[in-house]
Swiss-Prot record:
Name used for this protein in its record: Large ribosomal subunit protein bL21
Subunit structure: Part of the 50S ribosomal subunit. Contacts protein L20.
PANTHER family: 50S RIBOSOMAL PROTEIN L21 (PTHR21349), LARGE RIBOSOMAL SUBUNIT PROTEIN BL21M (PTHR21349:SF0)
Lineage summary: Bacteria, Pseudomonadati, Pseudomonadota, Gammaproteobacteria, Enterobacterales
MF terms (GO), sorted A to Z: rRNA binding; structural constituent of ribosome
Protein role: This protein binds to 23S rRNA in the presence of protein L20.
Keywords, in A-Z order: Ribonucleoprotein, Ribosomal protein, RNA-binding, rRNA-binding
One Gene Ontology term from the biological process aspect of the record: translation
Family: Belongs to the bacterial ribosomal protein bL21 family.
Source species of the chain: Salmonella paratyphi A (strain AKU_12601)
InterPro entries the UniProt entry points to: bL21-like, bL21-like_sf, Ribosomal_bL21, Ribosomal_bL21_CS
Length: 103
């Protein structure tokens, strides 16, 4: 059984027991969260597709950890003008473990 849901403007395909990295959520570590924006649920041959969301579809998950991703360097450069600029960015994320999928 697997499902597709959206969180943080992105879509994720998950199954029970899987750990997923999402955009930062303001929820404490160890708490549970329910995602109601379920786009599709598949259980073997039976597939439910939402328009846009599946009625009664809920994905339950537990927050495992928060953190920051690897640094991405942004470089701006103009040749022959002695102009160089560097900037770094580290995106916050939340790891969640899927505990249940229901339709």
């Amino acid at each position: 059984m697997y499902a597709v849901f959206q969180s943080g403007g992105k879509q994720h395909r998950v199954s029970e027991g899987q750990t997923v990295r999402l955009e930062k959520l303001d929820i404490a570590t160890g708490e549970t969260i329910e995602f109601a924006e379920v786009l599709m649920i598949a259980n073997g041959e039976e597939v439910k597709i939402g328009i846009p969301f599946v009625d009664g579809g809920v994905i339950k998950a537990e927050v495992v950890a928060h953190g920051r991703g690897e640094k991405v360097k942004i470089v701006k450069f103009r040749r022959r003008k002695h102009y160089r600029k560097q900037q770094g960015h580290r995106q916050w994320f939340t790891d969640v473990k899927i505990t249940g999928i229901s339709a």
